[in-house]
């Protein structure tokens, strides 16, 4: 077995282990952040500052009975959370998380694969995760799950169109779909960040990413007040945990991608080294998603569709036209 294959396998194992751990810890952070905004304590009983709440939740999920409803399609019911997990982790393959570094005289590239269409690969594979809520809802033999899967189809497909059109303008400026090249394009300094050249694209992509991630205020797929837990209504134990681990893994992936595409990625930020800089940026966008969840109310399905097709889509197309004109001039 070649050294390249061994290195790639090690990277995959590290990526899955790290982001699985981060996904579990993110539940604790989010509960603490929401508690702060709502003037309460959040997790505080299990361990110091409630830090062992993550371990307690993990033990609970692993030991709960795995229930499959009567009349459900067992194979598809089991396959759905696996699709969610695979989609979330495979989409991370082209993301350069840190600058290259040397270990024992061997140069390490902290990404799985530097493919020329890295950004498109990230969006396409991430969008394949739409099959998870669709299949979960169809296989559960539950009306609330079915409504949740129908909402998933409409919401995720609609905003996938917007996010794909939104990234065209920044890609026209850079001239490459590779996330490594996009990061390198912004290596000249603070003023080279694409957020200053494409502010509208940044805002549209950020909003579309929240809709694709099923984050508040766009969490119509599992809106408790209307459809119980949506497509997850009949899930319990480890399968339920897999859905939400995939959601947090996607959140971290989008946070890194937004940091790379619009905020200079892992290029050094003044006196701050590049590796620390990208962690600060990605951490901020994870926190921002939690802040938005604590601040904004849910939107109605009709409001969501109106915003997508009547506001965001025309703005994305306008941004493409204006960017093309500026480049030609």
From Swiss-Prot:
Pfam assignment, any one: NADHdh
EC code: 7.1.1.-
TM ranges: 9-29, 42-62, 75-95, 117-137, 154-174, 188-208, 238-258, 269-291, 309-329
GO molecular function annotations of the record: NADH dehydrogenase activity; oxidoreductase activity, acting on NAD(P)H, quinone or similar compound as acceptor; quinone binding
Lineage top rank: taxon: Bacteria
Keywords associated with the record: Cell inner membrane, Cell membrane, Membrane, NAD, Quinone, Translocase, Transmembrane, Transmembrane helix, Ubiquinone
Record's bilayer topology term: Multi-pass membrane protein
Catalytically driven reaction(s): a quinone + NADH + 5 H(+)(in) = a quinol + NAD(+) + 4 H(+)(out)
Record carries keyword NAD: yes
GO cellular component: plasma membrane
GO biological process assignments: aerobic respiration
Family: Belongs to the complex I subunit 1 family.
Subunit note: NDH-1 is composed of 14 different subunits. Subunits NuoA, H, J, K, L, M, N constitute the membrane sector of the complex.
Function: NDH-1 shuttles electrons from NADH, via FMN and iron-sulfur (Fe-S) centers, to quinones in the respiratory chain. The immediate electron acceptor for the enzyme in this species is believed to be ubiquinone. Couples the redox reaction to proton translocation (for every two electrons transferred, four hydrogen ions are translocated across the cytoplasmic membrane), and thus conserves the redox energy in a proton gradient. This subunit may bind ubiquinone.
Protein name: NADH-quinone oxidoreductase subunit H
Gene source species: Helicobacter pylori (strain HPAG1)
Gene field: nuoH
């Amino acid at each position: 077995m070649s050294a390249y294959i061994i290195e790639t396998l090690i990277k995959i194992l590290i990526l899955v282990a790290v982001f699985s751990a981060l996904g579990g810890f993110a539940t604790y952070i989010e509960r603490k952040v929401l508690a702060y905004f709502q003037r309460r304590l959040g997790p505080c009983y299990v361990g110091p500052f409630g830090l062992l709440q993550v371990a307690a939740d993990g033990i609970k999920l692993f030991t709960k009975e795995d229930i499959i409803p009567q009349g459900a399609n067992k194979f598809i019911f089991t396959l759905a959370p696996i699709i969610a997990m695979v989609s979330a982790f495979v989409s991370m393959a082209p993301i350069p998380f840190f600058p290259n570094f040397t270990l024992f005289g061997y140069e390490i590239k902290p990404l799985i694969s530097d493919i020329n269409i890295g950004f498109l690969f990230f969006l396409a594979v991430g969008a394949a995760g739409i099959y998870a809520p669709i299949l979960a809802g169809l296989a559960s033999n539950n009306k609330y799950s079915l409504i949740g899967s129908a909402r998933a189809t409409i919401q995720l497909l609609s905003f996938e169109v917007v996010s794909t059109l939104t990234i065209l303008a920044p890609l026209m400026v850079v001239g490459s779909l590779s996330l490594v090249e996009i990061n390198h394009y912004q290596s000249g300094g603070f003023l080279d960040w694409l957020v200053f050249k494409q502010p509208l694209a940044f805002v549209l992509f950020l909003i579309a990413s929240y809709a694709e991630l099923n984050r508040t205020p766009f969490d119509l797929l599992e809106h408790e007040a209307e459809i119980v837990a949506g497509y997850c209504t009949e899930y319990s134990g480890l399968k339920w945990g897999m859905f939400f681990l995939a959601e947090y893994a996607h959140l971290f992936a989008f946070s890194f991608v937004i940091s790379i595409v619009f905020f200079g990625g892992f290029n050094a930020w003044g006196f701050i080294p590049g590796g620390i800089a990208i962690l600060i940026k990605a951490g901020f966008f994870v926190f921002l998603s939690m802040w938005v969840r604590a601040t904004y109310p849910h939107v109605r399905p009709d409001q969501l569709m109106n915003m997508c097709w009547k506001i965001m889509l025309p703005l994305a197309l306008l941004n493409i036209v204006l960017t093309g004109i500026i480049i030609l001039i």
